[in-house]
Amino acid sequence: MDTSSVQRIRRAQLHVQDTGGSGRPVVLIHGWPLSGESWAAQVPALQDAGFRVIAYDRRGFGRSEKPEHGYDYDTLADDLAGLIVDLDLHDAVLVGFSMGGGEVARYVSLHGQDRLGGVVFAAAVTPCLMKSADNPQGPLTPEKAEEKSAGLKADRHAYFDGFTRKFFSVDGELQVNEVQRQATIGLCLQSNQIAALGCMHAFSTADFREDLKRISVPTLVLHGDSDAVVPFEGSGALTHATIGHSELHVLKHAPHGCNTSHADAFNTALLGFLRSS
């Protein structure tokens, strides 16, 4: 039965959607600055295939508690660990979209893989976005990161309008309809400003290169080839190269928000991995 609840996970109350049942658990970890509702195209497909689907809102986003602190990846990974323990999940597959991929990587480093059966990095920010002398392949410069932060501080409505256009576009052309884009803006606006800025800083600066090397469970890297937000060459391609045993699936002509724009292809790749891992 599909249920929604608010659960105390360590220091934060998280809104959790849990389809229940005895199927293998799949935990969906949303991207910035959205909520669990951004998985609307995945939850029914996974449930119909017999999986137990858990989609939660990260602290500070959606319908979860919005504290003034805790927007670093160690804390966010602890929140995820608390959810997994509280729901007593085993053989779970973690699916991290965009910044959610960072939580997957950091969870493995801090909490191990005993309860996991696999992980998925979907349009994920791993291994390390920030370009530096130590990370010349990083797709994000310090100047661009500061520009993004300043834009969000100046006018969040305008920022989210521009962000969702880039999120869903390939070569400037939207890959979703306007109703879908406006719904995504609505999810963005549910975010707390402190949380949005804190997580923006976290995913812009975090380095997951060592975290990824710890992963030994079956792994899928799923990414759009036309991602303008988290370019494939500086993220998905490197994540796949770092995790030697990982499976790579590149969605053709797909933007960052590929789980919505290319939902059928995304779901086919995800279900194929879940059934084979």
Segments (PLM) and residue ranges:
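Conserved HGGG/HGGXW glycine-rich cap/lid loop of the alpha/beta-hydrolase fold
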Residues: 15-69
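Conserved alpha/beta-hydrolase "nucleophile elbow" surrounding the catalytic nucleophile
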Residues: 32, 92, 96-98
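Conserved acidic catalytic loop of the alpha/beta-hydrolase fold
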Residues: 75-92
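Flexible "cap/lid" loop of the alpha/beta hydrolase fold
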Residues: 105-110, 114-154
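Conserved alpha/beta-hydrolase catalytic His-Asp/Glu region
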Residues: 130-139, 150-213
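Short beta-strand/loop motif that positions the catalytic acidic residue
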Residues: 215, 221-223, 227
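Conserved alpha/beta-hydrolase "acid-adjacent" motif
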Residues: 228-234
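Catalytic histidine-centered segment of alpha/beta-hydrolase-like enzymes
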Residues: 254-267
